[in-house]
Amino acid sequence: MASDSSFPGASSNVAEYSVSEISGALKRTVEDTFGHVRVRGEISGYRGPHSSGHAYFALKDDRARLEAVIWRGSMSRLRFRPEEGMEVIATGKLTTYPGSSKYQIVIEQMEPAGAGALMALLEERKQRLAAEGLFDPALKQLLPFMPRVIGVVTSPTGAVIRDIIHRISDRYPLRVIVWPVRVQGDTCGPEVATAVNGFNTLPDDGPIPRPDVLIVARGGGSLEDLWGFNDEIVVRAVAASHIPVISAVGHETDWTLIDLAADMRAPTPTGAAEMAVPVKADLQASLASQSARLSSAMSRFFDQKRQAHRAAARAMPSADQLLALPRRRFDEAASRLTRALFVNTQKKRVHFDGHARQLSPRLLQRRLVELERGVTMLGQRLPRALEAFLRERQTAFTHRANRLSPEPILRRTRLTGSTLEQLDRRRDQAVRLLIERVKRRSQELDRLMRTLSYESVLERGFAVVFDAQGKPVKQAAAVSPGDALSVRFRDGDVGVVARAGLTIPDPTKGQ
């Protein structure tokens, strides 16, 4: 059996560590040695901040890979938005996790690895988005000449928004709606894209009016400061906007991808305000000038028409001048007509005399003899033709009579007789009904006449007064003293003489 001294290192003086001890010692060594380092590398595996606000990714080069983390506090202080593939310089400290034997860098500050790296990334993104057609000039929209509402996407504080509002107020005051965003840092791009999309989703008749034009503005700065406006999400939002967008990011020499996607690029925020609205005073002056030109043109037009009318009136002949030639032609035609009628009458008389001389009693006698002979011949032919016609009609009648059968005639006769009997009965019934109706109507009229007759009034004790001519007396003013009157009662007439001043007592007062 071998002794313990046969195992290598069994009696060595090397210190013995547990796993925890060696891991802790390694952690202290790494953190003490690399407590503050600057690491240059390419961002890999970046997916944006976690829900906690921290960001996890890796820095790599062509031979190694280093895990990295940025805590939420440091993330909010970054002046640019990290992106996949961006080459950066990270400042922080290395640390290890004993539980997994891994190490990483905790980044406190990070910046792009020089303008060259950002420009290379910017050029690659520009080419890719241009290939998708996001910068196509055919997609550009025209700015409205007279907007009602302007939407501004910028920081609510600072000189930019003040310059825009002041410039709009000077040129043509109208409503301005500001959508506040951060114009620098990691959240700049998403906030600007959200603002552009938000303005586009506003309804036309909502409580917040939908702008007619948008201004995305920011002051000047470095490439890193303006990097949020190169964000792909911003470019896509501006390119898809249904509202025309004016880009006013940085100074005139600063170019970002939003400038290529916007419908119009302004060199400064103040220039964007000037593009968005016209100058009210210029519009008023132009309107006044156009109105004056229109009035002058109308005056010249009417003056020219008036002068042309006067010239035409002067050149036009008078009515006597116009009618002189037709009147002379009419007189000449009338004189020619008289002569022509006389000549024509003479010609007709000569022609008639010529025909009259050609006529003679012997010629007339011969013509009469010819006519008598023709009439005699027609008279001789007429009996024979009439006899032939009658024989032909008789033959046709006999032929048709032989074809006729007495049965249809008898049937139709019986049917006609039955119909006549029915008509007779209906006629007698109608006559009786008519006689009864007339008799009832006559009786009703007789009763009505007796009711309306004055004789029925006499039956009730009244009397009718007639004058000497037998006409009824309708009023006392028609009777004079001494007039002979006749009073008719129910049972006869009584003669009376009218007297003056006689008052007849009212029979109703004695009752």
UniProtKB/Swiss-Prot annotation:
Annotated CDD domains: ExoVII_LU_OBF
The keyword Lipid metabolism is annotated on this UniProt entry: no
Entry's localization field: Cytoplasm
Assembly, per entry: Heterooligomer composed of large and small subunits.
Family of this protein: Belongs to the XseA family.
HAMAP family: Exonuc_7_L
Described purpose of this protein according to its UniProt entry: Bidirectionally degrades single-stranded DNA into large acid-insoluble oligonucleotides, which are then degraded further into small acid-soluble oligonucleotides.
NCBIfam families, per the entry: xseA (TIGR00237)
Protein name per Swiss-Prot or TrEMBL: Exodeoxyribonuclease 7 large subunit
Top-level taxonomy: Bacteria, Pseudomonadati, Pseudomonadota, Alphaproteobacteria, Hyphomicrobiales
